[in-house]
């Protein structure tokens, strides 16, 4: 498995956009495929915010993760964000998610980010805790109960 900037994998962009829309669309009901695809296409460089990375094997994309300045207009008080972690169903349980999270945290550390945030459903908290993330707060985001978590990227990479 290798992890590449999404700009290096243009053939996969429509499939990734569709997967993101299916996985995260309930939180953003006005979001559509064209917006998801446009957002991914705007992530043209590695080592900057925003960017998206894709985990790949020899024949397919396995998952993706983004590093964003702002993730959702309702939670702009925290920034930046690890966002849109998605692993294809057939690749789950194989360390793809962990590798993508570690890659994003490392990139944030290289950019000097003091605290990196994510939000997730409560059932996913143990997954992130085992990777060093801590609970920051909990609240309702639209119809969904979410947990905001944070990590100090520089502390993880030292």
Indicate where each model-derived feature is located.
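Active-site rim helix/loop that mediates acceptor-substrate recognition in acyltransferases
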Residues: 21, 25-54, 62
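A short beta-loop-alpha structural element at the N-terminal edge
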Residues: 1-16
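C-terminal "cap" of GNAT-fold acetyltransferases
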Residues: 119-122, 131-134, 138-158
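Conserved beta-strand in the GNAT
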Residues: 52-54, 60-70, 81, 86
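Conserved acetyl-CoA pyrophosphate-binding loop and the N-cap/start of the following alpha-helix
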Residues: 91, 95-103
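Conserved GNAT acetyl-CoA-binding A-motif
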Residues: 108-120
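Conserved active-site tyrosine of GNAT-family acetyltransferases
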Residues: 128
